[in-house]
A protein has these predicted regions:
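N-terminal catalytic cores of NTP/NDP-binding nucleotidyl/phosphoryl-transfer enzymes
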Residues: 9-71
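Residue-level signal for inorganic ion chemistry
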Residues: 26, 79, 118, 178, ...
Length: 308
């Protein structure tokens, strides 16, 4: 996949393209992209996904804090895995947001990006205030010799697959269901920072994680079985998200992972965790001994899950 930021490099090319934010690059997105590749192959033209590095709502509303499934780099990696020819990166600006659908199709898709065929997601709308629909897009495309077609709808069972639904699953700790819809386990990347070192005193040393991407969604509170990627190696991990009620941590939410069968100083290292299964919710224990007993059970559960 060739990532295109300078659209001048597309001169002389004709493309079969689709457009969207593609957060998560989930099953629904992959279904659309598969159809895109089929249309492109039939036309004998390269396939292209047009996307944005920033969430459009974050540009339009300064106080909006998106909760995303992917950083931009992760999104590019997952798009590349689909086998498309080009990923065209457009900066979503206020000026771009003010273009009507007709202006966008004419000046951006046709004149600037040389789109021959535009495949539209079955429920996708674009242009200022999303005022127009598919029928209007077809008319605007015909005026500049562009074919506009609507993609088939994809559903998983009776439910449509959406980034919003996957975010909801993660917030509800349903990481296995989220992984199925994403086609990969959800992950977080961050730096290991110094904590209170309470876990070490309890016999469960933990690495406290400061997530690199502030807009990425944090799954719901609880204990998880996770895969840990550190210094080129993969480990089993027991990860906790919460405010440590037994230790009176206030309202501060922490992410800390106990790496099974590992010892060593790893502060300031980069770490990635991928969520495999939710083990339990948060519990406030009356004593530290009760907490330690539960952590021993949790570690056995995590080890079994990650060994299966």
């Amino acid at each position: 996949m060739i990532v295109v930021r300078d659209t001048e490099t597309l001169k002389g090319k004709r493309l079969v393209a689709t457009i969207g934010f593609f957060d998560g690059v989930h099953l629904g997105h992959r279904f659309l992209i598969h159809e895109l590749k089929q249309v492109a192959e039939a036309a004998g033209l390269p396939s292209a996904v047009i996307t944005f590095p920033e969430h459009p709502r974050a540009v339009l509303h300064a106080d909006y804090q998106p909760k995303l499934l992917n950083s931009f780099e992760e999104k590019l990696k997952h798009l590349a895995s689909t086998g498309i020819d080009y990923c065209i990166v457009l900066d979503f600006t206020l000026e771009l947001s003010r273009l009507t659908a007709k202006e966008f199709i004419t000046t951006v898709l046709a004149d600037r990006l040389h789109v021959d065929t535009l495949l539209i997601g079955y429920d996708h709308r674009f242009g200022y205030n999303r005022e127009d629909g598919f029928e209007q897009y077809v008319t605007y495309g015909e005026a500049c010799d562009m074919r506009v077609i609507k993609a088939s709808q994809y559903s998983e069972g009776e439910a449509a697959v959406s980034s919003s639904e996957i975010r909801k699953l993660l917030a509800e700790c349903r990481v296995e269901e989220a992984a199925h819809l994403l086609t990969y386990p959800y992950g977080l990347k961050g730096s290991i920072v110094s904590g209170y070192k309470v876990g070490r005193k309890l016999g469960f040393p933990t690495a406290n994680i400061q997530v690199d991407e502030p807009f990425k969604i944090i799954p719901g509170i609880g204990v998880y079985a996770v895969r840990v990627y550190l210094n080129g190696q993969r480990y089993k991990g027991m990860l906790y998200i919460g405010n440590r009620p037994t230790l009176d941590n206030g309202d501060n939410i922490t992410l800390e992972v106990n790496i099974l069968n590992f010892s060593g100083n790893i502060y300031n290292n980069e770490i990635t965790v991928t969520f495999i299964q939710h083990v339990r919710g948060d519990i406030k224990f009356d004593t530290l001994d009760q907490l330690i007993d539960q952590l021993k059970k949790d570690r056995e559960t995590v080890d079994r899950i990650l060994t299966e």
